[in-house]
């Protein structure tokens, strides 16, 4: 996490203010050397959910020694132009994209759980390496889907109010202002949980009182979580609380996504029209979570071979994955299937909380050199129109 005072300047209310503040900061900053292996193509910003504006995200990535940076937001690419301008000012190559959930109805894996912990029949996919002249076309396509998602979010807020009578959340007053929806940003379950975290903190305070409140709500906290709740001086206290609430309450208040999920057929067509790279985001079964932040759950591993046949049939030609999040056995199998089906492999590990590092240490392993090379292919495609291997 960058210095809190710098972050506040780089999170100023408007993009122009943020970029102007960046110019002033750059006059007095010394960046560490870049590391050729440090790439990350999946950095969230305030245009979905993150402590970082697009400008702050690029700055933070460069401060950690990344040699490239990539923006990915939920249902939105509205932060991309600011991200690119900040990258130009800092002098770091950048790639842009977004992610969304896709209905798998009509495919051979319809009705199955793939990479979505909350819902069967709906898969997460990323749209990578978007040519810059097509940003607005992509943004316009997702505008009605964002509106539909808001309607579902209102139902989940109502579910919270029914589940927790002492909490009265109002979508328009408490949740919507936490997002950049009015500027084309996406509103997610994390915004809802963050709103709940703010409400609980306002009602209860921090420290022992919060620990007791959560236990009274039926939550069993780990020692790590208790320590976080006792750290009343941490400037992002509500982010830690959000993580606790998300795990405990999203399964209880979740409403299935429907109208906000384009069909896979429509998304494949869109990506061809805008000349972007559509990627299936591999998750893999979670046993003992590599990162310790996911419960044990089955995902796509039992029928991964069939899923690859589905992707090939439907016109998806790339897979993105996170080496830090999977076991060596999962990665070996996945990479073999990518080779067998001629799938372009890319990588990025989602950044959406202040405790996360932007660095993917796994990239230091020569085994993943292809993922570094792929990142430069994404950048060259955006900048110069070079064809991707898809």
Task: List each model region and its residues.
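A metal-dependent hydrolase metal-coordination microenvironment
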Residues: 33-187, 314, 320-379
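Active-site mouth loops of central-metabolism enzymes
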Residues: 40-52, 289-302
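Substrate-recognition/cap regions that form aromatic- and gly/pro-loop-enriched pockets
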Residues: 271, 279-285, 293-320, 326, ...
């Amino acid at each position: 996490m960058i210095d809190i005072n710098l972050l506040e300047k780089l999170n100023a209310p408007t993009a122009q203010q943020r970029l102007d503040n960046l110019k002033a900061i750059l006059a007095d900053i010394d960046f560490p050397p870049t590391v050729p292996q440090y790439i990350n193509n999946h950095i969230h910003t305030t245009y979905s959910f993150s402590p970082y504006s697009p400008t702050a995200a690029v700055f933070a990535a460069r401060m950690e020694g990344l040699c490239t940076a990539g923006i990915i937001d939920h249902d939105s690419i509205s932060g991309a132009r600011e991200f690119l301008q900040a990258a130009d000012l800092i002098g770091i190559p950048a790639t842009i994209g977004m992610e969304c959930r896709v209905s798998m109805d009509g495919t051979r894996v319809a009705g199955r759980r793939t990479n979505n912990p909350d819902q069967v029949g709906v898969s997460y996919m990323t749209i990578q390496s978007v040519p810059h002249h097509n940003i607005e076309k992509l943004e316009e396509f997702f505008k009605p889907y964002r509106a539909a998602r808001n309607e579902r979010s209102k139902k989940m807020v109502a579910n919270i109010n029914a589940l927790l009578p002492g909490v009265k959340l109002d979508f328009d007053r408490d949740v919507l202002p936490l997002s950049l929806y009015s500027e084309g940003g996406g509103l997610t379950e994390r915004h809802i949980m963050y709103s709940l975290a703010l409400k609980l903190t306002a009602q209860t305070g921090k420290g022992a009182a919060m620990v007791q409140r959560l236990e009274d709500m039926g939550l069993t906290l780990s020692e790590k979580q208790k320590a976080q709740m006792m750290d009343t001086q941490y400037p992002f206290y509500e982010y830690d609380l959000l993580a606790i609430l998300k795990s405990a309450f999203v399964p209880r208040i979740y409403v299935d996504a429907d109208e906000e999920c384009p069909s896979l057929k429509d998304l494949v067509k869109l990506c061809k029209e805008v000349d972007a790279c559509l990627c299936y985001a591999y998750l893999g079964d979670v046993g003992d979570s590599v990162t310790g932040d996911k419960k044990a759950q089955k995902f796509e591993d039992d029928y991964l071979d069939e899923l690859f046949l589905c992707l090939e049939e439907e016109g998806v030609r790339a897979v993105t994955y996170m080496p830090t999040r999977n076991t060596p056995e999962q990665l070996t199998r996945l990479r073999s299937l990518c080779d067998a089906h001629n799938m372009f492999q890319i990588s990025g590990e989602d950044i959406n909380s202040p405790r996360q590092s932007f660095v993917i240490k796994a990239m230091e392993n020569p085994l993943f050199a292809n993922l570094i090379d792929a990142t430069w292919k994404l950048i060259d495609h955006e900048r110069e129109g070079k064809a991707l291997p898809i």
